[in-house]
């Protein structure tokens, strides 16, 4: 079995990738997005279907994209992996990841998973990203893309016809720990004019403890999450790759 690297997929390849993701979702009771908006794709095809006894076109896939930030001067790649349920524990993940390491030696690797664990395989847990949602009763009008206060600012966009996306909340340093973040949110979400927006959604990093505490106090609910793991290639004491 060979590992193939691609930067783009044709329609047939997209169907094959989505079939494998759907199969893994059913097996693992997860709900990974079927979208394929990634920068690169590694795959292992099911070239010997009679031998494997499996109908799917792909046995394993690894997909990733470059995050818009750096760590110690190196770009960060976020990657996710799907291995056919009947082919797990047979080294396919290792084949994919070794190809990734060889091709992206100067990048930091992080693996994304739906489930939070202390470690994913031998990769240590780093942090989680939570997707929060709050129902607005009554519905409100659009509060504005940028709303300024003497002590901070908040930023919104329209996610769809019924939902707002809160993508920024800033409180000046000298006003922090005084309840100003809560005051901003309550003014926007509870005192705005009546309108059509029934929900507000946002994303928050689990390492931002103050923000998580605020949103939980404001009755936001966790609707989904992604956990990230340090995917750096393991090295021996002599500095060589394991």
What kind of feature is each model-predicted range?
Residues 58-60, 124-127, 152, 224:
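A structural microfeature
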Residues 144-173, 182, 192:
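Intrinsically disordered, low-complexity segments enriched in Gly and acidic/Ser/Thr residues
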Residues 1-12, 133-146, 236-242:
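Conserved N-terminal entry element of GNAT/NAT acetyltransferase domains
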Residues 79, 109-114, 166, 200-204:
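Conserved hydrophobic beta-strand within the GNAT/NAT acetyltransferase core sheet
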Residues 78-89, 169-176, 205:
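A short, internal acetyl-CoA/4′-phosphopantetheine-binding micro-motif in the GNAT/acyltransferase core
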Residues 2, 7-11, 22-105, 152-164:
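Conserved donor-binding loop and adjoining core beta-sheet/short helix segment
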Residues 68, 73, 85-143, 229-231:
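Acyl-donor-binding surface of acyltransferase catalytic domains
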Residues 89-102, 171, 177-190, 194, ...:
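Conserved acetyl-CoA-binding loop-helix of GNAT-fold acetyltransferases
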